[in-house]
């Protein structure tokens, strides 16, 4: 599913060159669970941003589901990412103006899933995560743990092949 070879990421600012990733190689098969651990500033978020197609590597190869994706332009990355990759962000990234149900439904709308199917999927995932009773609440009305469950629901409602958290 994921194959990364000699991945590097270099950030340039004025006079400073920062090597966030240097020669990272890994392979993750379908169904495997992998934890990336390390101290602050070691490149974990940079790696996840590249794996999630939010950024490109400076060099190296990255293939996802057999497709070389490491050098895709932003629009191509967005189209490839939709429906294939689910994210649970550290800060949840819920939209304050949308209730729980609407937040979870959002990625399905972006994929063009018909309204009836969207409704069924949202109801089911909220039931599974024991959040049905909060469907019409807004993020600011939820505890941190409840917000995290909504973020998880939104990440998995599209049935992605890759989940990054």
What do the predicted segments below correspond to?
Residues 1-165:
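ABC family nucleotide-binding domain
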């Amino acid at each position: 599913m994921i194959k990364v070879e000699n991945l590097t990421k270099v950030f340039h600012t004025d006079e400073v060159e920062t090597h966030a990733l240097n020669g990272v190689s890994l392979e993750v098969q379908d169904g495997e669970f992998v934890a990336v651990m390390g101290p602050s500033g070691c490149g974990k978020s940079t790696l996840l941003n590249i794996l999630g197609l939010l950024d490109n590597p400076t060099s190296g190869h990255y293939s996802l589901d057999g497709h070389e994706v490491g050098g895709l332009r932003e629009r191509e990355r967005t189209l490839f990412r939709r429906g294939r990759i689910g994210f649970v962000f550290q800060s949840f990234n819920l939209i304050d103006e949308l209730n729980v149900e609407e937040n979870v439904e959002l990625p399905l709308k972006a994929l063009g899933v018909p309204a009836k199917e969207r409704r069924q999927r949202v109801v089911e995932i909220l039931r599974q995560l024991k959040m049905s009773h909060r469907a019409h609440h807004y993020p600011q009305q939820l505890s941190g743990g409840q917000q995290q469950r909504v973020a998880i629901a939104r990440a998995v409602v599209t049935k992605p092949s890759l989940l990054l958290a």
